[in-house]
Amino acid sequence: QVLIIYVVIKGIAMADVERGRELAATHCTRCHVVGDINPYGGIESTPSFIGMKRLADWERRYAEFYILPPHPALVRIEEVSAERDEERPAFVTEIVLTLDDVDAILAFVKTLPAQAP
């Protein structure tokens, strides 16, 4: 019975990791280098996902990324963030995520090495 629970939990966790990887590939690669997904992509001035893991508070930064600049101008979290102000110029397509999506991205980031291979 314990093994079955472990397998189910592990399966859910792996599903979150895979969903987080897909979300990161779709949205985060616009600006960041995200592991092996786009090793030569991203914007030069933005930190890579692996580089961020070197910071002592990396987990908090990923869990709360949507409140840290410049993300509030780009990302809206359903049922958390305010709607985009119509007066604000839309220089990029808004990214709309849920808190479950944020958790999935964090689950994926936890699988990345703290240093580039």
Residue locations for each model-derived region?
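Stable alpha-helical elements in mature extracytoplasmic
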Residues: 16, 23-24, 58-62, 101-105
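Short glycine/proline-rich, acidic loop/turn segments that cap or connect secondary-structure elements
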Residues: 68-84
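C-terminal capping alpha-helices of c-type cytochrome domains
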Residues: 80-117
